[in-house]
Amino acid sequence: MQIAEVMKKMVAYSEGNTHDINHLLKVWAYAKTIGELEKLDEKTQRVLEVAAILHDIACPLCREKYGNTNGKYQEQEGMPLAQEFLKDCGLSEDENERIVYLVGHHHTLGDSIYFCY
C-alpha cells in the first residue's frame, strides 16, 4: 500500500473530523519534509511518514472513553489501534512494529534506542 492509500484510509478512519484530518496532514508534511532533508533511506522514510499519519489514531476513542485526548491515553490506546489499522497495509512486520512503537510513544520524552533505526 502506498503512502497515499494509507492517508486515504486514515482520513476515512477520522470520520470527517476536520481538526484531526488537518492535524495529521500537517504532521505528515513536516515529517515527510524532515525525512527528505535528512536523506533517509526509503524504508525509514516510509516508517516515518506512516507513523506521522497514524500518530493520533487513538484521539477519537480517547475523546469518547476519557473525555479528552491526554497524551498518555493516546499512547495506551493507540498501539492496538495502529496494529489493527496496519494489518492490510502491506508493510513488513518490522515496519509495523516500529510504527506501532512510535504511535505508542509519541508523547513520551526521553532517549530511546527504538527511535533510532
Put a short name on every predicted segment.
Residues 46-117:
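Divalent metal-dependent catalytic cores for phosphoryl transfer on phosphate-bearing substrates
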Residues 1-8, 22, 42, 76, ...:
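Generic alpha-helical secondary structure signal
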Residues 15-48, 83-89:
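Alpha-helical phosphate/pyrophosphate-handling elements in metalloenzyme active cores
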Residues 3-9, 33-40, 55-61, 116:
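Short, mixed-charge, low-aromatic patches
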Residues 2-26, 58-69:
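Active-site flanking loop/helix segments enriched in acidic
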